[in-house]
């Protein structure tokens, strides 16, 4: 038996005015997903427990079968693990976004966050900037590490997680940052690093070139997602099978790595609609040759939600359907039996541009046990089935049951 999870990050949504008050799932042409849904168990699942923030960290841990109430220590430590940082028990890791702040004469605290990802800056440009920041601001206490695109890492030696509210930048796009900077005393050294980064980055040659090319500058770091070293139990130890992960983003690769799952590196995997869809599908099939389960994560729908791009979100769903699922179907033909689970981790509604905690649609298809499902899967048809998984982390055990 082989198992495949296809995770469409942030795919679920609310009705979108620009889409005639339909959701992207309703608008997308997705014949392959709908074909599975017609022969599968379909329902809703609550991936984010009450009291937890609806982040991709918590939600993906749930889908992968790890209870965040037991295992979650923060977002950035998982990303740090992915890029090979060996954290000490006394270290604190913080996500370090490269963002675009308004270029005006106002004090730093009064600037507006124009883009949480600096126009989806390339990994190559970002590495130059993060290494420059580490050269100028790094100390024995603070060390910056480059990651992928706009997503990077700060390790704080003997740091604290008692930092007040360190707001995710994608939650406040278009807003003045004054009320979103932590006022906690322990956070002030971090706020100072952010302020100093603006002065260092605003006239950096990389940003001068970006502006000349019509792109937004990556003119500040933004620190959030703090946490201590994670301690996940190995996936195989819990579930008795070998698992693997395919993703463009460090967070998901970090969860997989911490759980002792095999993690693929796919050239051209970007985390946006320009990602190497075929490469990720083929990497998943390669992993299935020596693993029992593969978890394929696609970031693009989530990014489009954050960026208020309804047409691109629809297209992201369609591209996975066109360019990933057919490859998986063909590659799975040789196995006597297999199961496929498709779902988002959480909604990323276009109208709010940030994550939500609402239950999300899921489907579980079993090759040798096809059942009557729904003609098309979306938020409404999944709800109409009456199937509901209240405890998100239980979905993995359910998926693996015969």
Give residue spans per PLM region:
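Feature captures the catalytic ectodomains and active-site-proximal regions of enzymes
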Residues: 1-402
